Curated annotation (Swiss-Prot):
Its main location: endoplasmic reticulum. The keyword Manganese does not apply. It comes from Rattus norvegicus. This is Protein C-mannosyl-transferase DPY19L1. It is a multi-pass membrane protein. The lineage of its organism: Eukaryota, Metazoa, Chordata, Craniata, Vertebrata.
């Protein structure tokens, strides 16, 4: 059948290598091809197309033999990785441009953050309060390690934590993806010790007068201040990310103009690409730069004909660095594995290469499982199940070859096997290990397609960032021309795929099809774009994957593979700069809007609350309340709390439901009884939570009506307690926002 012919093409015996130059040995079993690998502009010509040498203009320069030794091999590899062929000068100029992009982005996000909060002039308490919700929770563990007597004692404290989910003792390093805080705390301690040793001042402090009858505060600036150090490292990392984007665009398109397009598209759509300048401590701020590196490595592996062990090791390390800081990383990698499997099924990569990629992902998953102290969510994830299913399907390839079906039917069969197998294995492993921590993700996705509602799902969907993508978002993409450019590129890739598939289904002659199914990296990027689009449409927060990937895809406007027919008539530079000039009209306006954001952080009601807790309650007093407020109480007042904003644990979700019953219509004695079981001493009540409504059906009493229909129609408990907290609670503190209720024990 057709499949057997295609299989012969994929797994045919390799040609003997030419002794053109020395290079590192490929992995055992890898196909050996000509020693000079073909880059994006040096692919063999298709039948009926003139070769590169036959074009008008200067002849392409041949690559010089790589010098002997490790340094020579590294230099040659760097030239190749950047898609360059004209010597070291072009390589270093490319790296210089990448460094400039990194510096520019670092300066941009640093200035935006300072403009928004006036962070350099805030007191320590104000800086901590500026890290709201889960940001404050994550920063609290950095603070714990920094202030501990020693680094190891600080790590032991966060691994045996009683403040976060009192009275439970939990390993927060296992639960909350805190390796970034551990690493940054170690760097901070090393930095301050070295600076103290050599006598260099690391921070400058002064008194800031706030006016309006407020007491003066002490404000410190410099890397010796923990909060400043923490934020500075995050911004440096995300500055380096822009260098990766430049290299990524350059490599994918085969032109430094492609790198320029990627970087400028990112800046022109900056508000849609990242939120690191507003929310530095979020997990994505640490994790996403390593996804950019990881996808660059995947692109390199797909493009090259020889598969080197070093590339796979680098991919494994980048996988680990991407997964360790962020619990959501596994879902992103699931979309990548699905895209790669689709690329394999239709014939753009061979079995051997996909097997090595799958093994690399498996190894990185196991490493993360070990480093996360056996976090079972990793092994029971859809990502892990997908890896196992694809591994099994690759092992069963001979059985698929024996199926007497058409090529198209076989593609559908393999896709259905992967989908059904992944879902089934995920369900089985979750039941076997008794894991329900990620059940809310399935419920959230179900609610997007059906009318399913429950308490946890509504807490997510009532937040704007977890709602569907805004209707204005595609319009904003269109105004900067990002969407039209990407659509043109996707159309060009789609045309290539259709032509390739026609050849495969028609069972064309083998060596002709060999050229047609090259460049699987382009197909992978198109499929990955579709996956990110689906995620971004379903959950607005996830457009932070979609928009940067669109910027990377935009670099392909410089690709001769896709637009060689156009560049034969018009100079590529003219096309690119014309497009960038049109993009800059709205893009510069977007940047100006960001630069015009000027403010200063202030939250006097919460400052009063924290100061009262510090001075009027015992150190072991236990608090409950809204998740964002609890993060601040733990961080700044150092008091035990029973709930917090990290919602990815089934037990914590059950605790939060009990705590939030204060905003239900239940009887006060029932709520009090449950709070006493959690050993709560004080409850921080916020009247705004009782009346706040982001959209119909999204006030807390309305959410509780779905969960507790028996009490629907009654007066919400929070409304009753705002007026009079007796006899079950005693009001011990109150200001314009917060009301602290002491739980009366009888």
């Amino acid at each position: 059948m057709v499949l057997q012919a295609r299989s012969k093409h994929r797994d045919a015996a390799p040609r003997p290598p030419r002794p053109a130059r020395s290079s590192p040995p490929p992995l055992n079993g890898a196909s050996e091809v000509a020693a000079r690998e073909l880059g994006p502009e040096r692919a063999p010509p298709s039948p009926g197309r003139r070769s590169t040498a036959s074009r008008k203009g200067p002849r392409a320069e041949t690559a010089a033999p790589a010098p002997d030794g490790l340094a020579g091999r590294l230099a040659a590899g760097l030239h190749w990785a950047l898609g360059l062929r004209r010597g070291r000068g072009r390589t270093w100029s490319t790296l210089l441009l990448a460094s400039f992009a990194a510096l520019l982005h670092w300066s941009h996000i640093t200035q935006l953050f300072e403009n928004d909060r006036h962070f350099s002039h805030l007191s320590t308490l104000e800086r901590e309060m500026a890290f709201r919700t889960e940001m404050g929770l994550y920063y609290s563990y950095f603070k714990t390690i920094v202030e501990a007597p020693s680094f190891l004692s600080g790590v032991w404290m966060i691994m045996n934590d009683r403040l976060t989910e009192y009275p439970l003792v939990i390993n927060t390093l296992k639960r909350f993806n805190l390796y970034p805080e551990v690493i940054l705390a170690s760097w901070y301690r090393i930095y301050t010790k070295i600076m103290d040793l050599i006598g260099i001042q690391t921070k400058i402090c002064w008194t800031v007068t706030r006016g309006e009858g407020l007491s003066p505060i002490e404000s410190c600036e410099g890397l010796g201040d923990p909060a400043c150090f923490y934020v500075a490292v995050i911004f440096m990392l995300n500055g380096l990310m822009m260098a990766l984007f430049f290299i990524y665009g350059t490599y994918l398109s085969g032109s430094r103009l492609g790198g320029l397009v990627t970087v400028l598209c990112f800046f022109f759509n900056h508000g849609e690409c990242t939120r690191v300048m507003w929310t530095p401590p979020l997990r994505e701020s640490f994790s996403y730069p390593f996804l950019v590196l990881q996808m660059l490595l995947v692109t390199h592996i797909l493009r090259t004909t020889q598969l080197y062990r070093g590339s796979l090791i680098a991919l494994c390390i980048s996988n680990v660095f991407f997964m360790l800081p962020w619990q959501f990383a596994q879902f992103v990698l699931l979309t990548q594995i699905a895209s790669l499997f689709a690329v394999y099924v239709v014939g753009y990569i061979d079995t051997y290469k996909l097997q090595k990629i799958i093994y690399t992902h498996m190894i990185s998953l196991v490493l993360c499982f070990v480093l996360m102290f056996g976090n079972s969510m990793l092994l029971t994830s859809y990502y892990a199940s997908s890896l196992v299913i694809i591994w099994g399907m690759l092992a069963m390839k001979p059985q698929f070859l024996k199926m007497n079906v058409s090529e198209l039917s076989l593609w559908v069969i393999q896709g259905c096997c992967w989908l059904f197998g992944t879902v089934t294995l995920k369900s089985l492993t979750s039941r076997i290990f008794g894991i329900a921590d990620d059940a809310h993700i399935g419920n959230l996705l179900t609610s997007k397609f059906f009318s399913y509602k429950d308490f946890d799902t509504l807490l997510y969907t009532c937040a704007a960032e977890f709602d569907f993508m805004e209707k204005e978002t595609p319009l904003r993409y269109t105004k900067t021309l990002l969407l039209p450019v990407v659509l043109a590129i996707v159309a060009a890739i789609g045309r290539k795929i259709i032509n390739d598939m026609r050849g495969v289904i028609a069972n064309q002659e083998t060596d002709v099809r060999k050229h047609q199914v090259d460049h699987g990296e382009l197909v992978y990027h198109a499929l990955q774009l579709f996956a990110y689009t689906a995620l971004g449409i379903l959950i607005m927060r996830l457009k932070l994957f979609l928009t940067p990937h669109m910027c990377v895809m935009a670099s392909l406007i410089c690709s001769r593979q896709l637009f060689g027919w156009l560049f034969g008539k018009v100079h590529p530079g003219a096309v690119v700069f014309a497009v960038l000039a049109a993009m800059s009209i709205q893009g510069s306006a977007n940047l100006q809007t960001q630069w015009n954001i000027v403010g200063e952080f202030s939250n006097l009601p919460q400052e009063e609350l924290i100061e009262w807790i510090r001075h009027s309650t015992k150190p072991d007093a236990v608090f409950a309340g809204a998740m964002p407020t609890m993060a601040s109480v733990k961080l700044s007042a150092l008091r035990p709390v029973v709930n917090h904003p990290h919602y990815e644990d089934a037990g914590l979700r059950a605790r939060t439901k009990i705590v939030y019953s204060m905003y239900s219509r239940k009887a006060p004695e029932d709520v009090k009884k449950e709070l006493i079981k959690l050993k709560v001493n004080y409850y921080i009540l916020e009247e705004s939570w009782c009346i706040r409504r982001s959209k119909p059906g999204c006030s807390m009493p309305e959410i509780w009506d779905v969960e507790d229909p028996d009490n629907a129609g009654k007066t919400p408990l929070c409304n009753i307690l705002v007026k009079d907290s007796k006899p079950h609670f005693t009001t011990v503190f109150q200001n314009s926002v917060y009301k602290v209720l002491e739980v009366i024990r009888q």
